[in-house]
From Swiss-Prot:
InterPro entries: CoB/CoM_hetero-S_Rdtase_bsu, Cys_rich_dom, HdrB/HdrD_reductase. Its EC number is 1.8.98.5. The heterodisulfide reductase is composed of three subunits; HdrA, HdrB and HdrC. It forms a complex with the F420-non-reducing hydrogenase (Mvh), which provides the reducing equivalents to the heterodisulfide reductase. Part of a complex that catalyzes the reversible reduction of CoM-S-S-CoB to the thiol-coenzymes H-S-CoM (coenzyme M) and H-S-CoB (coenzyme B). This is H(2):CoB-CoM heterodisulfide,ferredoxin reductase subunit B. It comes from Methanothermobacter marburgensis (strain ATCC BAA-927 / DSM 2133 / JCM 14651 / NBRC 100331 / OCM 82 / Marburg) (Methanobacterium thermoautotrophicum). One of its GO terms (cellular component) is membrane. Belongs to the HdrB family. GO terms for biological process: methanogenesis. The gene is hdrB.
């Protein structure tokens, strides 16, 4: 199986460990991730899509045409990128007039949108194409951790277009997490936004941090060891946001933040250097030390 790997902007610039873990994981699964040469920003669904739908769709469609030239479906592990690319693909496949309008724009770049590929999310590929049984075979170090799963906004919605899971009571990420040996802990307002999306973080950081602070409070009350997400922007909001909340409110949560790819990487036994967790703002060492201690105490560990 081959798939066009759309990186987006935040992951490879701020959290390269997500990409590293993904490449190692998919190599072990026998899935080839093909680089999308010339791909640009997705662009962001809330900001661009709300103010200039035509330009937003044209930029997204251009990215899709790169995958069409490669003859492969697109996979991304950013909810915002997934939202823009999936919704544009759906829109242009359904609306011939809009498709023609976008292709007039793309003609200036020598490209044409044909509607020949699908846009897929990293987690959905793992769940539907790989399967939980295959993933469990790769687990070398079961993770005895309590984690708060954060779904985010664009992974499952709009639900009339995206049919991955129940948008209000999903289980797909919880099931993948528990393959690693970790426990997905329920917490209040689990499906609430992280606070970053829709241009909120850029326009009004205080409002964004109010969202984040509320979610972190609920997670801490649930007694979690780490937060697991499937979007680098959500990841940034929980990671950098904890430092910003400390500065603004004087509150310290100290909850490590891991992308699902990094959590799977830990379960596969990848060293923290490969996961580049040292690039995170919130230190993950306490979480890793807990795993190492449990590993030492495990029967047969010597």
């Amino acid at each position: 199986m081959e798939i066009a790997y759309f990186l987006g902007c935040i992951m490879n610039n701020r959290y390269p460990g997500i990409e590293k873990a993904t490449r190692v994981l998919f190599d072990k699964l026998g899935i080839e991730l093909k680089d999308m040469e010339g791909a640009s920003c997705c662009p962001a669904p809330g900001v661009f899509g709300s103010f200039d739908k035509t330009t937003w769709a044209a930029i997204a469609a251009r990215n899709i045409t790169i995958a069409e030239d490669m003859g492969a479906d697109i996979m991304t592990e950013c909810n915002g990128c997934f939202g823009s690319l999936f919704e544009t693909n759906h829109l242009l496949k359904e609306d011939e007039e809009m498709k023609a309008k976008i292709n007039e724009i793309l003609k200036e770049t020598g490209r044409e949108y044909k509607g020949e590929v699908n846009v897929r999310h990293f987690a959905e590929v793992l769940y539907n194409d790989v399967g939980l049984d295959k993933l469990s075979e790769l687990v070398e170090k079961p993770l005895n951790l309590n984690v708060a799963v954060h779904y985010g906004c664009h992974f499952l919605k709009p639900s009339d277009e995206i049919n991955i899971d129940n948008p209000e009571r999903p289980t797909i990420l919880d099931e993948i997490v528990e393959v690693t040996g970790a426990k997905s802990v329920e917490y209040k307002d689990k499906m609430m936004c992280c606070g970053a999306g829709g241009g909120v973080r850029s326009r009004d950081l205080d409002v964004a941090l109010d969202f984040t602070r509320e979610k972190l409070t609920n997670m801490k009350e649930a007694g979690v060891d780490a937060i697991v997400n499937v979007c680098p922007f959500c990841h940034l909001q929980f990671d950098v946001g904890q430092m910003e909340i400390k500065d603004k409110f004087g509150e310290e949560f100290d909850i490590p933040v891991l992308h699902l790819a990094q959590l799977l990487g830990l379960a596969m036994g990848l060293p923290k250097e490969d996961l580049v967790v040292d690039a995170h703002q919130v230190c993950v060492d306490e979480c890793l030390e807990k795993l190492e201690e449990l590993d030492r105490l495990a029967p047969g560990s010597g």
